[in-house]
């Protein structure tokens, strides 16, 4: 899980989702998991 100021899709499988006001990136590639913070 990377915590970043700006979350971006890193590949075509990445999805940007908003959960409880937190922007997250979910992906089958574990290295691509991110959240905004």
UniProtKB/Swiss-Prot annotation:
Keywords: Ribonucleoprotein, Ribosomal protein. It holds the Pfam family Ribosomal_L36. The keyword Ribonucleoprotein applies. GO terms for molecular function: structural constituent of ribosome. GO terms for biological process: translation. GO terms for cellular component: cytoplasm; ribonucleoprotein complex; ribosome. Belongs to the bacterial ribosomal protein bL36 family. This is Large ribosomal subunit protein bL36. It comes from Sulfurimonas denitrificans (strain ATCC 33889 / DSM 1251). The lineage of its organism: Bacteria, Pseudomonadati, Campylobacterota, Epsilonproteobacteria, Campylobacterales.
């Amino acid at each position: 899980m990377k915590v970043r100021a700006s979350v971006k899709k890193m590949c075509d499988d990445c999805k940007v989702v908003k959960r409880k006001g937190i922007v997250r990136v979910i992906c089958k590639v574990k290295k691509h998991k991110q959240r905004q913070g």
